[in-house]
């Protein structure tokens, strides 16, 4: 695995259209569970005023005046304008995701069940309050389901929305944690984690979002294009029209790959692919 190609071995080869499920006939017990999931999800949204910012590697504009990254896909620095939106302060947890699966009449993911029942390890990271790791399509369907049942335009974030939010409104912040500082594992003031912890275990970034630097990665709505920044439109960019992998953002495998500008990618049908959070668009 490289820092920028966040790929796992297990792949679920299911057509995207088959995953666009709808609610089964819900029981009297499930109806309030459904409404609770929807209400909690939207109550956890953080309002983010839109604005204009410079997206990409801004290292030449600050401090040492040198690029932060050697990855050419983070360049050129380019202007982006975004409308107001809301973003979930937490990644969706296994507890939330598995409740959603049950509402669809679906079983827990096969690999999740195998690991959960394993006698080799306790797999703490599969606990209900830990970030879920799912395929891109399941993540997108989950977010759109929230929108369909709440009358709101809910989806996965675009890559531009995510970077703008991680940088707390597009500021020149290279780390998405609470103080824009790198803290090594032995540092008692460390405020992010490279491995799994319950969602929201560390302080949020300045606008109130948790785990934008560590504790996994987030799926983006966008297809990945290594040269996309060369032709990205300024207004609310949505990514390339097509591709083979989807963008992921967050902790990508090393301290050098925790930057708010770092771009990763993963196959959208990877079953245990990435974490995710939803956005609400106007």
Predicted segments with their positions:
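Functional-site microenvironments in short loops/helix caps that host divalent-cation chemistry
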Residues: 54, 58-59, 64, 118-272
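Intrinsic structural disorder/low-complexity segments
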Residues: 11, 36-38, 180-182
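Compositionally biased, low-structure terminal segments
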Residues: 4-5, 17, 256, 277
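Extended beta-strand/loop cores of jelly-roll/beta-sandwich
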Residues: 19-160, 251, 263-282
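Bacterial N-terminal signal peptides that target proteins for export
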Residues: 2-10
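Bacterial N-terminal signal peptides
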Residues: 10-18
